[in-house]
Regions:
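Hydrophobic beta-strand-centered segment that forms part of the acyl-chain substrate-binding groove
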Residues: 1-4, 73-112, 138-140
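HotDog/MaoC-like acyl-thioester-processing domains
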Residues: 2, 35, 77, 105-109, ...
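Small/polar/charged residue-enriched interaction surfaces, especially the RNA/DNA-contacting tracks
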Residues: 3-4, 16, 38-41, 91, ...
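Short aromatic-glycine motifs in intrinsically disordered, low-complexity regions
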Residues: 7-17
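Beta-strand-rich interaction surfaces with strong enrichment in secreted/lumenal proteins
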Residues: 11, 55-56, 100-103
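Catalytic strand-loop segment that frames the active site of acyl-thioester-processing enzymes
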Residues: 18-59, 64
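Conserved positions in beta-strands of structured domains
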Residues: 24-27, 97, 102, 116-118, ...
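Active-site helix/loop of acyl-thioester processing domains in fatty-acid/polyketide metabolism
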Residues: 26, 59-85
């Protein structure tokens, strides 16, 4: 299923704002198969590059995982809306089952996040994500999340 959401449309669903909104676009959303594909354009203007690391700027791995989680949260909230669950929701981290970092992400990179729901229930879910730059996997993780009504 083809789908597109720009950053303004993402902010209608997710509560995150600058400097912590870490996805720029949703390229695909398939609620029947619980899959989402999102983009993060990494620029040298990101605040974290001031100290991580000035001589070799690398995006912190925890922020790559957070961006992956935000893509998963977008999917979970849209799924809840499709199922008729009313109200505003926030998706909270409930755990990181596993995470691996394969290559550094640097300014100028575009990260493609491919996230799928492995076991999504009404208010809890497990998601699996892969982050890629130029077709190469830079990180992967299995995350737990909880859907909480605001």
């Amino acid at each position: 299923m083809s789908f597109y959401a720009d950053v303004m449309q993402i902010m209608e669903i997710l509560p995150h704002r600058f400097p912590f909104l870490l996805i720029d676009k949703i390229l695909e959303l398939d609620l029947d198969n619980l899959k989402v594909k999102a983009i993060k354009n990494v620029t040298y203007n990101e605040d974290f590059f001031m100290g991580h690391f000035p001589h070799f700027p690398v995006m912190p791995g925890v922020l790559i995982i957070e961006a992956m989680a935000q893509a998963g949260a977008y999917m979970m909230i849209q799924k809840a809306k499709k199922e008729g669950i009313e109200g505003d929701y926030t998706v909270l981290f409930a755990g990181i089952e596993s995470a691996k970092f394969r290559k550094p992400v640097q300014p100028g990179d575009q990260i493609i996040f491919e996230v799928e729901g492995v076991n999504i229930k009404k208010s809890m879910g497990k998601i699996k994500g892969i982050a890629k730059v130029d077709g190469q996997t830079v990180a992967e993780a299995v995350l737990m999340a909880a859907l909480k009504k605001n």
